[in-house]
């Protein structure tokens, strides 16, 4: 989202200026317009950059995770707590981000490559960011449905496991009668 917003900034500026775009802006729009090779190259580079930037600076700080593991008595098997855990987490996250950022760039560039050249009058615009949002919403919906179905399976299992006898249908023990006094 950050990459596409920054790359569409020249188009947005030219829209506000009306039909009067200077020669510099016309050149920028010609080379960096959506679907152009330089646009796609910068888009991929910015996706990779923002993937690393966001992961390391916002969502997953390895020093904080290593410190939390150490404070809570947790550890990674074979890795000593503290600085070595932090180094190991940095190593693993870097390797995962190489594959993850390449995948994100591929998914975001795929619609642009598919639509270029675009037939005139084609109203369907489906960008890479839209694809990512749709896929994440579908995956989240599937996870919610699966957890709901699993909860119903557990309810059925609990109902089937209750034994008849001293317990009622709810599984609660029947109250005892007080002994008779003589």
Swiss-Prot record:
Q: Which GO terms describe its biological process?
A: protein transport
Physiological role = The central subunit of the protein translocation channel SecYEG. Consists of two halves formed by TMs 1-5 and 6-10. These two domains form a lateral gate at the front which open onto the bilayer between TMs 2 and 7, and are clamped together by SecE at the back. The channel is closed by both a pore ring composed of hydrophobic SecY resides and a short helix (helix 2A) on the extracellular side of the membrane which forms a plug. The plug probably moves laterally to allow the channel to open. The ring and the pore may move independently.
Q: Which residues cross the membrane?
A: 30-50, 92-112, 119-139
Please give the organism: Paracoccus denitrificans
What gene is this protein a product of? secY
The similarity comment for this entry is: Belongs to the SecY/SEC61-alpha family.
Q: Which Pfam families match?
A: SecY
Where does the record place Basic residues bias?
166-182
Q: Which domain of life is it from?
A: Bacteria
Q: Which InterPro entries match?
A: SecY/SEC61-alpha, SecY_dom_sf
Q: Which Gene3D superfamilies match?
A: SecY subunit domain
- Please provide, in alphabetical order, the Gene Ontology terms of the cellular component aspect for this entry: plasma membrane
What is the protein's name according to its record?
Protein translocase subunit SecY
């Amino acid at each position: 989202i950050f990459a596409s917003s920054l790359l569409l900034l020249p188009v947005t500026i030219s829209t506000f200026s009306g039909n009067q775009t200077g020669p510099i802006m016309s050149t920028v729009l010609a080379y960096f317009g959506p679907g152009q090779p330089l646009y796609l190259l910068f888009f991929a580079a910015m996706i990779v950059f923002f993937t690393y930037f966001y992961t390391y600076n916002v969502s997953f700080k390895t020093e904080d995770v290593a410190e939390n593991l150490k404070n809570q008595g947790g550890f990674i098997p074979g890795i000593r707590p503290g600085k070595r855990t932090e180094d190991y987490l940095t190593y693993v996250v870097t390797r995962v981000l190489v594959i993850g950022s390449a995948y994100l760039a591929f998914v975001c560039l795929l619609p642009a490559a598919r639509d270029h050249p675009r037939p005139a009058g084609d109203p369907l615009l489906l960008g890479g960011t839209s694809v990512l949002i749709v896929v994440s919403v579908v995956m989240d919906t599937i996870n919610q449905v699966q957890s709901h179905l699993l909860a119903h399976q557990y309810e059925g299992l609990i109902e089937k496991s209750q034994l008849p006898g001293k317990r009622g249908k709810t599984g609660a023990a029947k109250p005892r009668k007080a002994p008779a006094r003589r």
